[in-house]
Design a protein with these regions (language model features):
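Sequence-level preference for short, compositionally simple segments enriched
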Residues: 1-183
């Protein structure tokens, strides 16, 4: 009932390197799509109408064959949402990778700096949240994150404030690869 039929369409019309803040309001619903916020988009806030009822979901996993080669796609192409831009905020939204437990399946893949996630849910199994770039900073506030095997991983500096982190299996929660020179 909004101006766009998908979250990806709303992101696509944003201007590159905006100096002002752009807010994308997402109505309640389930959006089955892969969303990429490219590196040239900055100062965007994506706000869901209701955290539990505004869901972006997809079901890729590491063993899905690529159409071009037939080879497995691997971990880093499995994302549901990939954020390459800087100064991006997500609020009141669920990001889910609902692939069966057939290998790595990333819900959130981050590459941008100064990313903020407020009152969001991140759902998956293995590798739910990938903090993907060295020397980038992420802030998670009042979020819920669940998974099975090392489901928060990567080299970014990530701060978790008042978050619930739930392991769905008896396994490791994190697999940080923060460089040794970062304290």
């Amino acid at each position: 009932t909004g101006q766009f039929r998908s979250v990806g369409e709303a992101v696509e019309v944003c201007r590159a390197f905006m100096e002002y803040r752009k807010v994308i309001f997402v109505k309640k619903g389930v959006y089955k799509e892969k969303v990429v916020v490219p590196s040239w988009l900055t100062n965007i806030e994506i706000v869901g109408e209701d955290r539990d009822k505004t869901v972006i979901t997809y079901d890729d996993h590491a063993n899905v064959p690529l159409k071009e080669t037939g080879l497995p796609m691997g971990t880093f192409r499995t994302y549901t949402v990939k954020i390459e831009g800087c100064d991006i905020t997500l609020r009141n939204i669920t990001i889910e990778n609902n692939a069966e437990r057939l290998g790595q399946a990333v819900a959130l893949h981050t590459e941008g700096d100064r990313l903020t996630f407020v009152n969001c849910r991140f759902l998956g199994n293995q590798d739910t949240v990938y903090t993907g770039m060295q020397n980038t900073r992420l802030c998670f506030e009042d979020c819920y994150i669940e998974g099975t095997t090392d489901f928060i991983f990567g080299p970014s500096t990530a701060w978790f404030e008042n978050c619930e982190i739930r392991s769905k299996a008896d396994s490791y929660v994190t697999a940080a690869s923060t460089p040794a020179d970062i304290q």
